[in-house]
Amino acid sequence: MELRSWLLWVVAAAGAVVLLAADAQGQKIFTNTWAVHIPGGPAVADRVAQKHGFHNLGQIFGDYYHFWHRAVTKRSLSPHRPRHSRLQREPQVKWLEQQVAKRRAKRDVYQEPTDPKFPQQWYLSGVTQRDLNVKEAWAQGFTGHGIVVSILDDGIEKNHPDLAGNYDPGASFDVNDQDPDPQPRYTQMNDNRHGTRCAGEVAAVANNGVCGVGVAYNARIGGVRMLDGEVTDAVEARSLGLNPNHIHIYSASWGPEDDGKTVDGPARLAEEAFFRGVSQGRGGLGSIFVWASGNGGREHDSCNCDGYTNSIYTLSISSATQFGNVPWYSEACSSTLATTYSSGNQNEKQIVTTDLRQKCTESHTGTSASAPLAAGIIALTLEANKNLTWRDMQHLVVQTSKPAHLNADDWATNGVGRKVSHSYGYGLLDAGAMVALAQNWTTVAPQRKCIVEILVEPKDIGKRLEVRKAVTACLGEPNHITRLEHVQARLTLSYNRRGDLAIHLISPMGTRSTLLAARPHDYSADGFNDWAFMTTHSWDEDPAGEWVLEIENTSEANNYGTLTKFTLVLYGTAPEGLSTPPESSGCKTLTSSQACVVCEEGYSLHQKSCVQHCPPGFIPQVLDTHYSTENDVEIIRASVCTPCHASCATCQGPAPTDCLSCPSHASLDPVEQTCSRQSQSSRESRPQQQPPALRPEVEMEPRLQAGLASHLPEVLAGLSCLIIVLIFGIVFLFLHRCSGFSFRGVKVYTMDRGLISYKGLPPEAWQEECPSDSEEDEGRGERTAFIKDQSAL
C-alpha cells in the first residue's frame, strides 16, 4: 500500500514537472473548461450542459456560456477530444472551444522602495508581523494609482520634494483665506505642520531619495487649509464638501476638545455635508471620510462624545503602539471601527513622514498619525475595486481587520464570532487582505434604517436604570433588517453630574457595548439632548430580540436625573426577497456581472436595477455614475434613486427643506417643508396630578433638588464673580496703602519698593511694558482665533 502511494506521488510530481516545462516552452495547456455558443437563453444552455455531464458556470456575455467538467483533467498537454466531440454534435451548439491557460503578468513591477527612511517605517515592513501588511498590497500591484485623497487640516506644503510629484490642486483649497493655495502659514514654532505630516503618510513619493514613502505612494494628494483660523460650521461644511466627484477619500485628524468634559459634534451644515458626501460623492458611491478617534485618553475622555467619530458616515480609526499596547492618549469607545499603528512610550518608535520646511520627521504621533495610514490603505483598496461604496469599505474593514498582537483587557467575541474591543475596534487594518477581498467584492445591499421608539414615559435613573425592549427590527415592513451594521441609541436625559454616568447597550445576541464610560472631568449638569451614541460592535448580528439599555451612577454620590427619551436606530440590510422590491425593468446598459448602470428613459437606477417609481424615502435625480470597465472607470449621466435627507421620511428633493413627510419622532413644518424634532417638553409625559394633601413629602424633595440643579450653574457663576471682585478690591486697596498712594493724587505708585510673587512662577521684578502698535499687529498675526474650539489630534 505504501509502495502504491509512493508511485502515485512520483507520477503526480513527474506530471507537474512536465506541465511546468511545457509552460516554460510555450506549449498549450488545456483546462477542464469550455466556452460554448448556445442561442436560446440560459435554460437551453443548462439543459445541454446537464445532458453531457458539464456544469454551466454562467453567462460570459450574450449567448456565450462557460462550461466546466469535473471528470476532465484540470491541466493537460492535449485537448479532451471525446467530450469536445459529443458536445459539438449537439444541434443547439453553434461554436465551442476548450479553454487554454494563458500566462498573464501584471505590468506593475514591485520593487521595495529605495527611499532612505523606508527601513525605519516599521509599520509598513515589520519583520515580526507587527505591521499593516502594506508590502503585500504593493506586491499585488496596488499603490494608489488613480485615487485622490485630501487632508482636511492646517494646509500642506505642496512644494515639499516628497509631496510635489503627487500633489493635486483639484483636491486642495484654502478655506481660511479663500484662495486655491493650501500652503501652510509658517511660524517660529512650526505650529502648522500637522497637515503636511499627515499628507506624507498617505502619498509621499517613492524611490526619489527623499524621506520615506506613503502607504499609497502613487495616489494623488491634496489638502484643505481650514484649521488655521476661525473654524465655523460653514468652514467645516465647505471642507467636507470640496469636489466630491473628484476626491475619493477625506482624512481628518481633528475634532472637539479632548478634555474629558466636552460633548460636541457637527452642526447643521457639516452634518449635511457628510450626508451629501455619502449619498452623492464619487458619483453616488459615496465619499469616504476617515477620522482619528481622539487623544483624550489621559483625560478619560470618550470618543462617543465626539459627534465626528461617533457618526455612521465616518470610518473611525484608533491607535496601537509598536509593541501592540493601548497608547496613553487613546480614547476607548464603541464607535471605533479599526486601528493602525502610531506612537507609544519613549522606548517605542513613532511614525516617519514629511515635515514643514521640506524636511522629514521620525516623530509624528497620536491618532493624528493613525487616520492617514488608514486613508492610504483605503486608497489601495479603492484602486483594487473602484466600484466600492462607502459602506462596502466599512464591511471590508470589519471582515479583514486583525485582533492579533493587540493587547487589551476588553476583547470580546460578538454574536457572529468576531473579536472586538472598545480600544481597537475590530483590530489592525490589513492592507493585503483588504485589496485581495476587494477585487471580487459584491456590493452590499442598500442600507435600511429601522427606528424603534423604546421609552414611552420618563424614568428616574437613580443609582441604576435598566430598560428592556423586545424588537422585531421592523418585521413585515420594507425597512426590515436581519443583518446589522451601525446601531444608535438616541438618548435624552438630565443628570446633575454627567461625568458620573456609564451607559451600556446589550444586543439580542449578547454583545455588550459601552456607549459611555465615566468621565471624571465632566461636571456638567446639562445631560444629553437626543445624543446618538453609536456602536459598531454588533456588525452582522440579527437585531431581532430583546435589547437592554443600562445606565448607572459610577460614583458614591447621591446623584439624580431622568431618562426622558430612548430611540433605538438600527442600520443594516436583509436578504433579497424578505421585502417586496419595487417593479424592475427598462435596463439600457448592463455590466459584465449583469448589473444595470443606465436605464431607459422614464426609469431610474435603484439597487442595480431600473424602476419606474423610486421607493419611499428616495427621489429620482440625474447624476454622474461611475462604473469600472476592464481597463478604466467610465462616468455616465443617469437617473438614480437618491435617498432623501436623513431628517425626511419622504421628499421632493435631497435638501432638508424638501420634506413631504417626517419620521415618527419629528413633525413637518408645512411652510419651511422641514422636519423638526419635537421639543423636549412636548416629549415628556406629564405626571398625573394628585390632591395636594395626598402628595407625600418625598415627592417634593426631588422636584426641589431638580429646580435648584437647573439654576445651580447661574448661582455659582454669580457668587464666583462677586468673590473675585471683592478679592480684587481688597488687594488693590492693600497695595495702594503699602505704596503710600493717595486718592487725591499726591503720590504715585511705583514697583521698585518691592517684589510681586505669582504662585507657580519664580519671584522676579515686574516691569510694565506697553507694546508699540507694530508689535501689537505682529502679535495679532501670530494668534489664531477659534470661534469653535478644535484640537489637532
UniProtKB/Swiss-Prot annotation:
Ca(2+) 1 binds at residues 115, 162, 205, 208, 210, 212. Its cofactor is Ca(2+). Seems to be expressed ubiquitously. Expressed in islets of Langerhans. It is found in: Golgi apparatus, trans-Golgi network membrane; Cell membrane; Secreted; Endosome membrane. Its EC number is 3.4.21.75. Ca(2+) 2 binds at residues 174, 179, 181. Gene3D superfamilies: Galactose-binding domain-like, Hormone Receptor, Insulin-like Growth Factor Receptor 1, Chain A, domain 2, Peptidase S8, pro-domain, Peptidase S8/S53 domain. Glycans are attached at residues 387, 440. It is a single-pass type I membrane protein. The inhibition peptide, which plays the role of an intramolecular chaperone, is autocatalytically removed in the endoplasmic reticulum (ER) and remains non-covalently bound to furin as a potent autoinhibitor. Following transport to the trans Golgi, a second cleavage within the inhibition propeptide results in propeptide dissociation and furin activation. The active site is at 153 (charge relay system), 194 (charge relay system), 368 (charge relay system). The record marks 75-76 as: Cleavage, second. It holds the Pfam family Peptidase_S8. One of its GO terms (cellular component) is trans-Golgi network. The keyword Hydrolase applies. Residues 444-576 form the P/Homo B domain. Substrate binds at residues 154, 191-192, 236, 253-258, 264, 292-295, 306, 308, 368. It catalyses: Release of mature proteins from their proproteins by cleavage of -Arg-Xaa-Yaa-Arg-|-Zaa- bonds, where Xaa can be any amino acid and Yaa is Arg or Lys. Releases albumin, complement component C3 and von Willebrand factor from their respective precursors. A motif (Trans Golgi network signal) lies at residues 772-778. Residues 25-107 form a propeptide. Residues 758-761 are annotated as: Cell surface signal. Ca(2+) 3 binds at residues 258, 301, 331. Binds 3 calcium ions per subunit. Interacts with FLNA. Binds to PACS1 which mediates TGN localization and connection to clathrin adapters. Ubiquitous endoprotease within constitutive secretory pathways capable of cleavage at the RX(K/R)R consensus motif. Mediates processing of TGFB1, an essential step in TGF-beta-1 activation. Converts through proteolytic cleavage the non-functional Brain natriuretic factor prohormone into its active hormone BNP(1-45). By mediating processing of accessory subunit ATP6AP1/Ac45 of the V-ATPase, regulates the acidification of dense-core secretory granules in islets of Langerhans cells. This is Furin.
